[in-house]
Amino acid sequence: MQLTSFTDYGLRALIYMASLPDGRMTSISEVTEVYGVSRNHMVKIINQLSRAGFVTAVRGKNGGIRLGKPANTICIGDVVRELEPLSLVNCSSEFCHITPACRLKQALSKAVQSFLKELDNYTLADLVEENQPLYKLLLVE
């Protein structure tokens, strides 16, 4: 399964925030510079992550963005469920005449559930803690 760029950059933004020293805020501009993604795209991503509680946005002079909860409580499977449209096929009888007898949708659904179940085994902390090579690449040492 290939994730959309929206989900990919959402995960990357969370990884960046989780790599920062505890409590340090960052900005959307800083995250976009690190990953080379458009600011408008990142604003949409951060807004959705914020609505889901994964990110906290603070307005004002000393504002910015940071994780909305501890990295060890943010399950990667939950983030993907929030950001990723998980419908793999468009099963509608008006588009496909085999829909009433087709078993493909069920098979793909089981595959997606297995994929998400595996991602549920990882937290954001699992991806960033004690990862010195990551810190060097993100320049957050």
UniProtKB/Swiss-Prot annotation:
This is HTH-type transcriptional repressor NsrR. HAMAP family: HTH_type_NsrR. [2Fe-2S] cluster binds at C91, C96, C102. InterPro entries: Tscrpt_reg_Rrf2 (IPR000944), Tscrpt_rep_HTH_NsrR (IPR023761), WH-like_DNA-bd_sf (IPR036388), WH_DNA-bd_sf (IPR036390). Its cofactor is [2Fe-2S] cluster. Binds 1 [2Fe-2S] cluster per subunit. One of its GO terms (cellular component) is cytosol. Pfam families: Rrf2. Nitric oxide-sensitive repressor of genes involved in protecting the cell against nitrosative stress. May require iron for activity. Represses hmp expression under conditions of elevated intracellular iron concentrations, in the absence of nitric oxide. It comes from the Bacteria. Residues 28-51 bind DNA. Keywords: 2Fe-2S, DNA-binding, Iron, Iron-sulfur, Metal-binding, Repressor, Transcription, Transcription regulation. It comes from Salmonella typhimurium (strain LT2 / SGSC1412 / ATCC 700720). GO terms for biological process: negative regulation of DNA-templated transcription; regulation of DNA-templated transcription. Residues 2-129 form the HTH rrf2-type domain. GO terms for molecular function: 2 iron, 2 sulfur cluster binding; DNA-binding transcription factor activity; double-stranded DNA binding; iron ion binding. Disulfide bonds: none annotated.
